[in-house]
C-alpha cells in the first residue's frame, strides 16, 4: 500500500474511532500535522456525513495551519470537499479565507455556495457584504437563506434594503432568516416591513418578524414575542 493511501486510511480510522469512543482521537504515529491535514481534507469527500463532520471538527482544531490547504481544497474536483472546506474555513475564522470564499459563492454547486455563505457569516469580514447581498438573488433558496443569515451576522447597514426585499422571497425559510437578520442589524428602516411580515402565512416567519421587532424596538414589541 502506498504511503498516501496508508495516510488516508489511518486518518479515516482515526475519525471513525473518534465518533465511536466519545469523539476522542487515536493518535496518528509517524505522520506530520501536514499529513494529517491532507488526510482530513481527503475525508471531506467521504459519503458518510459523520466522517465529513468529524473531519471538519478536526480541521477546525488544526487552526491556522489548515487554512492554506483548505483554500486549495475550494478548487477540488469533488463538490463535497469544496463544501466541507468552506465550512471548515468558516469555523477557523481566518481572514485569509475571505476572498477565496467570496469566489466560492460563484461555484456551480449550490451546497458549495451555501457553505461559502455560511463561512463568510462566521468570519464577519465586511469585504463579504456586497457579495452576500448579491447571493440573496441566488437561484437556490438554501444559498439565499445562508446569505441572509450571514448578513445578519455582519450587521452592516448596507444590507438592510436588500434583506427587506428578501422578506418577500417565495420560500418561507428565506423570509424567516431575512427577518432574523434584520433583528440583528437593528435598523429602524426594517420596522414597517417587519410589521407587515407579522401577517405572513407562515408561522415561523411571523415569529421571526416578532423577535426582530422586539430587538429593534423593545419598548413597543418585547411583550408580543411568543
Annotate each language-model stretch with its function.
Residues 37-40, 44, 105, 136, ...:
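Disulfide-bonded cysteine-rich modules in secreted/extracellular proteins
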Residues 16-18, 22, 38-42, 69-71, ...:
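Alpha-helical tetratricopeptide repeat
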Residues 3-17:
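Bacterial N-terminal signal peptides that target proteins for export
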Residues 39-40, 69-71, 100-101, 131-132, ...:
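Buried hydrophobic core positions in alpha-solenoid tandem helical repeats
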Residues 28-34, 50-64, 72, 80-94, ...:
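Structural detector for internal amphipathic alpha-helices that build alpha-solenoid repeat scaffolds
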Amino acid at each position: 500500500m502506498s504511503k498516501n493511501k496508508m495516510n488516508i486510511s489511518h486518518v479515516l480510522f482515526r475519525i471513525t474511532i473518534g465518533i465511536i469512543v466519545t469523539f476522542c482521537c487515536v493518535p496518528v504515529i509517524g505522520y506530520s500535522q501536514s499529513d494529517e491535514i491532507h488526510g482530513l481534507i481527503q475525508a471531506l469527500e467521504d459519503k458518510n456525513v459523520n466522517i465529513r463532520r468529524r473531519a471538519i471538527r478536526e480541521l477546525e482544531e488544526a487552526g491556522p495551519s489548515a487554512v492554506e490547504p483548505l483554500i486549495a481544497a475550494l478548487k477540488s474536483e469533488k463538490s463535497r470537499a469544496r463544501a466541507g472546506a468552506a465550512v471548515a474555513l468558516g469555523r477557523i475564522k481566518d481572514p485569509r479565507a475571505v476572498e477565496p470564499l467570496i469566489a466560492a459563492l460563484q461555484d456551480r454547486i449550490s451546497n458549495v455556495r451555501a457553505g461559502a455563505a455560511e463561512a463568510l457569516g462566521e468570519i464577519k469580514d465586511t469585504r463579504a457584504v456586497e457579495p452576500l447581498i448579491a447571493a440573496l438573488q441566488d437561484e437556490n433558496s438554501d444559498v439565499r437563506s445562508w446569505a441572509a443569515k450571514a448578513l445578519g451576522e455582519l450587521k452592516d447597514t448596507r444590507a438592510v434594503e436588500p434583506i427587506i426585499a428578501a422578506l418577500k422571497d417565495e420560500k418561507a425559510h428565506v423570509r424567516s432568516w431575512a427577518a432574523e437578520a434584520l433583528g440583528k442589524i437593528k435598523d429602524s428602516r426594517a420596522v414597517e416591513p417587519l410589521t407587515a411580515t407579522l401577517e405572513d402565512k407562515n408561522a415561523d416567519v411571523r415569529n421571526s418578524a416578532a423577535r426582530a421587532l422586539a430587538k429593534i424596538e423593545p419598548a413597543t414589541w418585547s411583550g408580543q414575542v411568543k
